[in-house]
Curated annotation (Swiss-Prot):
Coiled-coil ranges per UniProt: none
Record's keyword annotation contains Ion transport: no
Record-linked InterPro entries: Kinase-pyrophosphorylase (IPR005177), PPDK_reg (IPR026565)
GO MF terms, alphabetically ordered: ADP binding; ATP binding; phosphotransferase activity, phosphate group as acceptor; protein serine/threonine kinase activity
Protein name listed in UniProt: Putative pyruvate, phosphate dikinase regulatory protein
Top-level taxonomy: Bacteria, Bacillati, Bacillota, Bacilli, Bacillales
Its biological purpose: Bifunctional serine/threonine kinase and phosphorylase involved in the regulation of the pyruvate, phosphate dikinase (PPDK) by catalyzing its phosphorylation/dephosphorylation.
Enzyme Commission code(s) on record: 2.7.11.32, 2.7.4.27
Length: 270
């Protein structure tokens, strides 16, 4: 039984069937010769695989989501005396029976979900790497650039957009004593969003922040005159960039995120 040939047939990449076959074969003392046949779209290919499998006395294991293709392979393989094992079909049928929902019958759904997952991870890592202006090079690489003074929800908003919308977001804090990075004036203004907040609201938020850290709320950080100075600087920078401004004074992060996503979609940037 050494090098028993198994043809793995799929209407997508065939990774699912390959993994299942290897897991099953791992229970036996012989090494399987697994030959993958991916992206099968027609019965002609199935007929050819059956013929080859017959000549090699091989087993066919398959993941085909379309019922007509599954039935063709099972029927024709039986006629030729070839063993064909349906890995995913019975489970799809069982789930349909239990839930009453009709399957989509779309090949490659798992792979597309995997791709979406990795896009999300990439976006999250990007948000962490380019958070709080720690590397200005991220500004030119980002899908979205958030600009604002301290405590305008730049970081949580960046993470929300990464987690839920898979957008790569860089955020830039503005303080009067530090010139904004040059990249801020080089990036397309359509990618930039200024986060505006009223002085009173920011004063309250900063005082609460200081209290949570066990510090006096009388620090310069929460001083209303200092706050106004920062907001004036913010407005000066934003006027040069000429980007969209969102008042986040009384908005939840989800609401601000939706405004940004809608703006991006309207601009047809992606």
């Amino acid at each position: 039984m050494d090098n028993k040939i198994v043809y793995v047939v799929s209407d997508s990449v065939g990774e699912t069937a390959d993994l299942v076959v290897r897991a099953a074969m791992g229970q036996f003392p012989f090494a399987p010769d697994i030959r993958r046949v991916p992206y099968v779209e027609d019965t002609g290919t199935l007929k050819e695989v059956i013929s080859i499998a017959k000549s090699n006395q091989a087993l066919i294991c398959f993941t085909l989501v379309k019922p007509d293709m599954r039935q063709y392979l099972v029927t024709e393989a039986a006629k030729e005396g070839v063993e064909a094992y349906d890995i995913i079909g019975p489970l799809i049928d069982q789930i349909e029976e239990i839930t009453g929902q009709v399957p989509r019958y779309e090949p490659g759904v798992v792979r597309r979900l995997d791709e979406e997952y990795f896009k999300k991870i990439e976006a999250i890592e990007f948000a962490v790497k380019y958070d709080d202006g720690r590397d200005a090079r991220g500004i030119l690489k980002a899908d979205i650039v958030l600009i604002g003074v301290s405590r305008t929800s730049k970081t949580p908003l960046s993470q929300y957009l990464a987690h839920n919308k898979r957008l790569k977001v860089a955020n830039v804090p503005l303080v009067p004593e530090v010139d904004p990075p040059e990249e801020l004036y080089q990036v397309a203004k359509e990618k930039c969003f200024g986060l505006k907040i009223t002085p009173d609201k920011l004063n309250h938020i900063r005082k609460e922040r200081l209290k949570s850290l066990g510090l006096s709320d009388g620090a310069t950080y929460a001083n209303i005159n200092r706050i106004q100075e920062e907001i004036d600087h913010f407005e000066e920078v934003i006027s040069k960039i000429n980007c969209q401004v969102i008042d986040v004074s009384n908005k939840a992060i989800e609401e601000t995120a939706n405004i940004i996503v809608n703006a991006v979609q309207n601009q047809k940037m992606f």
